[in-house]
Each structure stands twice: as structure tokens, then as C-alpha cells.
Amino acid sequence: ITGAEAMMRSLEHQGVTTIFGYPGGSIMPVFDALYDHQNTLNHILVRHEQGAAHAAQGFARVSGEVGVCLVTSGPGATNTITGIADAMIDSTPIVVIAGQVGTGFLGTDAFQEVDLVGITQPIAKWSYQIRRAEDVAWAVARAFYIARSGRPGPVVLDFAKDAQNAKTKYEPAKLDFIRSYVPVPDTDEDSVKEAAELINNAERPLVLVGQGVELGNAQSELRAFIEKADMPAGCTLLGLSALPTDHPLNKGMLGMHGNLGPNINTNKCDVLIAVGMRFDDRVTGNLATYAKQAKVIHFDIDPAEVNKNVKVDIAVLGDCKNTLAAVTGLLKENKHTEWNDSFKEYEKVEEEKVIRPELYPATDSLTMGEVARAVSEATHHEAVLVTDVGQNQMISARYFKYSKERSIITSGGLGTMGFGLPAAIGATFGAPERTVCVFMGDGGLQMNIQELGTIMEQKAPVKIICLNNNFLGNVRQWQAMFFNRRYSFTPMLNPDYMKIASAYDIPSKRVYSREELKVAIDEMLATDGPFLLEACVIEEGNVLPMTPPGGSVNQMLLEC
């Protein structure tokens, strides 16, 4: 068989069912082979290769499986770079298969030749160029093993065109060990005992829940861990659905636009327990003042994250599904009633100063928060929330509630505008049984708006909620707060989104009032297929609370 056919069989052997891609010259032999595998491999034709990468991310994040995208060389490959970088920083398992010029043309600046391996090595777990057809099965097995094992991430396969056409004998390859690669470090038993002892003696423990809990499918272990010791928990943006919002020990969201309680009490706890999170700057604020009073325990699968940003006292390395269970087995039944009650005063202040004005505003105009909460309630808090980046991201994350696992998909570390729409498409294929709602701003919607064509063709049931404030809202908020309201190129003149939706044969509705909003949400959710809901919200609405740039987590601003 050809190398291209070997690629198809190798993908099937890995359990792949869905591919997001865009054909072109240097990948045509693979697409020709794909023509005969349409019964087993569902190819989704995107409208831009960046959309393919983000769709693969959305598929992976909601399903826990490896997302796959297939593109051509040159601009096709470079168009995936943002998605690869996004997947790397957010630990998302995807495999990007790109065509490449024939081996005889490498290094000659041939048509649509780029050094994809060189470009992607810093932003991928592994980048490899396939130059021989006989290497296909091995390379694919290695790629999927690396992408999904340990701390997940993106892998790039650069597939030379002559290797696609060359003949080879195919044998399925299985790989579960690479000598130079240790995906899960050994857990030190002493660290488990020390962590348990420190927690047992803590008076004010606080657990920080990251996406690693979901990546490790450790949600039930997390609940057992915090419940046994009666420990309050705060969730990072990517970890929000690892613990149900209404769980009594869930104190809310961490970070720059998170909730007061878990942020301020980070600097009041005596033991800080981080689980599957990396202490990024959006969570810590000013590191010089971050949790200096606390002993720090860090559960993580990646040794590189330990002591990178925050000095830890005990590192518990390994898969958190196993390490949490091990530590929980050594914990004493405990109660921290007074400590848990201390969060209530912050909840009361935030409710009065921020939440009520956002959800029950005095103005007739819609706020971003009330739109998000209304959609969450209408879906019984069971929808998959996909967000773009900006105010829409922070506001929907704050006001959505999460009752199911793997319910938030967003660009966390890279902050990629244009992520939301294609990621939502991927999510509908990764979890077809669930309602997928994507919140976007009027800025981000236009960054990959061409993917409405993919939605139209696939009839993907994406529920698109555009929060239209005629601004690049997040940047405008910073300009208002820190740049004397000098709105430098943040006001936006927008197209008529209703006409755009109509052109793509997507039902749509524009709303200005609360009465219109309720009717439109009901119509959106009753529609079998995609729907675009444009909510015209207060133009200069802000996302609060907010940790100011360079500020500490206990210096959150409640007003602009």
C-alpha cells in the first residue's frame, strides 16, 4: 500500500473517527486515500487551517480523546501554528498532520515549503518529519502515545509527499514505552505521607483546582479529598468544571477576574494545596506577595511546573487520580467550620457590590452577566460552555454554573481571540449528545467568522451567543481603568450579523431587552441545529472584580 493509505489505517488503528482539515497540493495523496475511508473517518472541511487546529482542540477537550487535523504544507501548515501553541500551553492532546514537499526538494525553498519541524519544536511535545512510507505506522503510534500520555499536548507530523506516494507493507504499530520519555513520574511515598501530615495539622487549608484534575479524570478523587478534610477549594479558569459549582466546598473562581473569597484567602490560608495547576500569573498576581504565609503542597504530573513560579514545600508528583487517592487514604476526618465560614463575608460583599448590579441592573440595557446566567439557567447548567477571549470569556465563566465534567472549553494560557467558534464546532463532534454554547464578543466573532461556513455545511448545532458592545471590550476596560479612558482603536463598527447569519442559512435573533432575551434563548435552544443570538449589551460594561496589573490577589478592585 502507499504511505498515504498507511496513514489512514494507522489513524483508524488509533481509534480516530473525526478529522478536521483542508486539502492542498502537498497532502493530496493522503486526501485521495481518505476518499476510500469515509465510512470510518469523518472528515470535517473547515474554512481555514487555524479553524482546523482549534476544532481539534475543542474535540479533544470535551471528549478526552486526541483531536486530529490534516492540512497541506506551507501556508496550510503555518496557519495551524496558533492552534498548536494554544494546545501546548493548555495541555490539549492534538495531532497535526501536515503535508510537506518531496524529500528531494527539502531545503530548496520549493513551492509551499517551510521548516515546520523547526518552527513547531518549541511549541509542541514532539515534531517529526516522515520521510519514508515504512515509518508511517511507527510515527503515528508514537505521535498518539506522546500526545495523550502524561501531561497531554500537541504533536506535529510533517509528511513528505514522496513518502505519501511510496509503497510499503503495513503492519499496525503499538507503542506504550519510549526509553527517553517518562510521561508520569514515580510518586515518592514520603511526599504522600508528608502532604497528608501537613493537611491533617492545617487549620486553614485551601485547595486550588486546576485543569489537571479533568485531564486526569480525577474529579471523584478530588471530591473525596476535599470532603474528608473539609477543605474549601477554588478553581482556575480551565478547572471550573472539575468540581460542581454548587458543591458546598467550591468557593468559586481563582484569578484576575475570579471571586473575592478564594483569591483573598489565598493570602490567609496556612496550607495551600495546588492540584493540577501551574501557578500562572493570572492566578497569582504579584508573586512577591503571593501566599507567603502558607506551606505549599503541589500535586502535578509535570516536574517542570514544580518550583517554577511558586516555591513549594512538598511536591507530590504523579497522576493526580492516584496521588489524590493515596493522600486521601491518610487523611483524618476533619472539620474547618470557622475557616469555611470566613468565605461568606467575601461572598456577601461580592454579591452586593458586583453580582447583584450585574444580574439585576438598574438600567434597561442588558448586561453581559445576565445574558450568561440566563443561558446557563435555560440549559439547566448542563451545557458545554465554549468561550472566545476577552470580556465574554471572563463574564461567561463567572456567571455560568457547571454541573457536569468537561464543561468549559476556553483558551486559557495563550488567550487566542478567534478560538471560540471553531472550538465549539469541534466540541459538537466530540460530545454530540450535549448542548454546546459558545460566547463571543463582536471582535472575536469576526476573527474566524468564516467557520460559519463549516457550521452551515455540517449543520453543526452550535449555539452562538455574541455579546455585542461595539468595542474590543477587554482592552477598552483597561484603557478606562489605567489609560485615562483614551480609547485608542477599541471602538468597533460592526456588520449586520443577522444578514451574515442569513447568508449562511443560520437562524438568528438580535435582542436589546430582557423580555426579548428570554424569548430568543428559548427559540435558540428549541432550534434543531445552529443558531446565532446577538445580545446588544451595555457598551461600557466592565468585568469585576479585577486584580490590577502588578497587584496582589488581596487587592481586587470592585469598581472601575
Model-derived features: where do they sit?
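Phosphate/pyrophosphate-binding active-site segments
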Residues: E134, E197, Q293-V389, R514-E523, ...
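Conserved short loop/turn motifs at secondary-structure junctions
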Residues: G210-E214, Y360, G441
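Active-site nucleophile and cofactor-binding loops and adjacent substrate-binding regions
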Residues: Y22-G24, H43-H54, C69-G76, R131-A133, ...
